[in-house]
Amino acid sequence: MKNIVLILLVLFSFNIMAQNKEPFKIYKDSTISSYNAILTSCKDADFVFFGEDHDSPIAHWLEYELLTDLYQVKKEELIVGAEMFEADNQLILNEYLEDKIDDKKFQEEARLWPNYKTDYKPLIKFCKDSSVQFVATNIPRRYASIVSKKGFEILDSLSSEAKSYIARLPINYNDSVGCYKEMLVDMGKEHATPNIAKAQAIKDATMAYFILKNYKKGNLFLHYNGSFHSDKHDGIVRYLIAEKKKVKVVVITTVSQEDISKIEDDNKNLGDFIICVTENMTRTY
């Protein structure tokens, strides 16, 4: 009996210690918040941008939880989209969602990210099983690539079909403000390549374009993207608001910190909610 009590005391002590090793905290306005606060805010939104670290298991878990919980509230009014799927793959994505092709064929023919099976397949499967519309919002990477080499002008030479997978041209671009300015500054004067920022902008503009193209009043559009694309309500959000001003947008962003007991100054204003993950967290790939 004494041995059992001793074991229970050891296990209890270990459990208390483990509870102090928190993998993440959620912040809003520099103060501790919660997942329920995120969910409550998102329920009334028109657009929700979940900015992820692409290899963060915490971000991907919360992405799935938010999807399933918002579906319980919005049902057929919920639309989902993601940076990880390119616009010219919309047909094959629809064919898979509508059971016209199987999972094996979809994975063979769609250009999927390396972490699709672990991180994005659960989202796709839920939308498939629940008949939720899923929009491939990103520009085909080959077009972003040529912009990074030759600038926006090269897009004018594309066919009408190719242009149908891109935001309407010309896009409004200013590299002296916002995230594109920051990108060029981070590169440094010696290594700054203006066309790299332009490639980022054409991605953001295209994602905003396809989000708005599929959105109808009363919908809630939940979009998954790398955090850089929506941090500080910039990037995709800037292009979206330029076209549709009187809407409620919620931005969630993911950051990593060594110490998550308080939010670092550089991370405070990145989003409406900040998911602050410990740097020791394992990665999905």
Where are these regions (language model features)?
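Alpha-helical scaffolding within the catalytic cores
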Residues: K25-I38, Y165, P170, A205-F210, ...
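C-terminal regions of proteins
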Residues: T206-Y215, N219-L222, H229-Y285
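Sec-dependent N-terminal signal peptides
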Residues: I4-F14
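N- or domain-start disorder-to-order transition segments that initiate the globular core
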Residues: I4, M17-A45
